[in-house]
Amino acid sequence: MMRTMTLALAAGFALAAAGTASAQVKFGMAGPITGPSAATGAQMKNGVAQAVEDINKAGGILGKQITVEYGDDVSDPKQGVSVANNFAADGVRFVIGNYNSGVTMPSSEVYQENGILEITPASTNPQVTERKMWNIFRTCGRDDQQGQVAGAYIVKHFKGKKIAVVHDKTTYGKGLADETIKAMAKGGMKPVLYEGINVGEKDYSALVSKIKQSGADLVYWGGLYTEGGLIVRQMRDQGVKAPLMGGDGITSDEFAQVGGPGVEGTLMTYGPDPRNKPEAKAVVAEFRAKKFEPEAYTLYSYAGVQVVKQAAEAAKSLEPKKVAEKMHSGMHFKTVIGDLSYDKKGDITRLDYVMYVWKKQPDGKISYVECPGSDCSKMK
């Protein structure tokens, strides 16, 4: 009798657990939670966490609550693949990540093999979506678009000037630098210096000496905020006054913290600041109430979760392939970063880059400000 009761209780607990699991849908967030890009990892993690909290409060997705597993890829491709395999083993269906293009690409292959849909809020290398994969999307733009904006700006405002181009040898950094050079070439310009550095280095004195010798009037940087900040600081230390210009990889307040006062005047390409959009007002207030400023990729990560929810509800399914089909269909999604729709590759259909300049704010802090009409020459 006791054995029968024990078996009955065990069966009851198993059914309860199964019922709980069936009432949930598992997401993963993969990004650099630690390492040199940890500030961006925090943006992504907070963006996903807040979106999940808000969606769950409103009833979840198709009546199921979202659970999230967080994976730290440390901006390393091998670790990204390890995280992807762990997510697959744990039954994750949807992933928001990764940050670095060079991590996203091998990770997305693991996700495809395991039927998992991935949306990156930050990986901008064109090849992320040029591999004819059903499962990879992004909420950001592409480097060929970003490079076109940067190169066109250089041709218009630095015609006849000397341009040095420096990159960090990564898929993202070198790719962005090369796309910018292509756009410059269309305007009859080419760099006087083209150099690659190693991520993680601290001493860029040799590089700065080359920049100084080149007589560069502008230094274009293809890379992230840590190395970019160090390069600017060391340029100023050696008396190089040429402004820096970079891409969305420097959109973090950490750039100014690392680079110091010398980052003022830095030019940058990035999407229109989503914090200023009416659609984001309530969510931005939620973040600020928690003492977290939703800069850079925070809202792009939040938007990724919103897209999955809306596509799943339109598809009336939580099967990743059916959700992907709905996303590829041209459906419009209402998100905190504005309306989005996707092409067959998984790219957003809007051109998403404008010009910014880093300048001192009334509170004394140096941060990035969108230039009216993308003309930073009019900014005082």
Language model regions located:
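Phosphodiester-processing cores and adjacent nucleic acid-binding clamps
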Residues: A18
